[in-house]
Amino acid sequence: CDVTSIQQVENLFKKADEILGTPDLVIFNPSARLRGTVEELDMRAAKKAIEVSTIGALSVAKEAATRMLPRGSGSIFFTGASASVKGFANSSVFAVGKFGLRGLAQSLARELHPKNIHIGHFVVDGQISPPLDTNNELDSKLISDEIANAYLHMHRQHRSVWSWEIELRPW
């Protein structure tokens, strides 16, 4: 699904409703990275990349919350990056999208936590090892199964200790 298409996101959730019912957990993971100096940027590509992390995330959050609120429970998690909290040279577009994503998650946490919807943001700070990578030296890359376990752990947190943000890094 192209998360920048509101219609495609709505259709995805309608199809999931038919097959799975109301979700307990929704994870927004899409990202678009565009590197380059500010004067070299293709603004059409920049706009699309920013929309993935902002409009896409907002659209997915709206559809997820609309389904979870009547039940009074659920978790909506967003995958950020180091660029969610600090900018890097030649990565301004990525930073705009990830800062926006983090701001959305922070706002939704304040809005939806009182309604028993757990909102979480994950700062994934490092390279991710492919699932079949047997050459991953200790502390060099994040292991994808362990990232998944971190998401599941946050989802299972007791409401009295809900985290809204967790940083994941291999060292």
Model-derived features: positions:
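The beta1-alpha1 cofactor-binding region of Rossmann-like NAD(H)/NADP(H)-dependent oxidoreductases
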Residues: 1-12, 43
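Active-site loop of short-chain dehydrogenase/reductase
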Residues: 22-23, 37, 68-81, 114-117
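Conserved NAD(P)H cofactor-binding loop of Rossmann-fold oxidoreductase domains
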Residues: 29-35
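A short, exposed helix-loop element centered on a Lys and neighboring polar residues
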Residues: 61-62, 106
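Catalytic loop of short-chain dehydrogenase/reductase
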Residues: 75-100, 106, 110-113
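C-terminal helical subdomain
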Residues: 114-130, 134-171
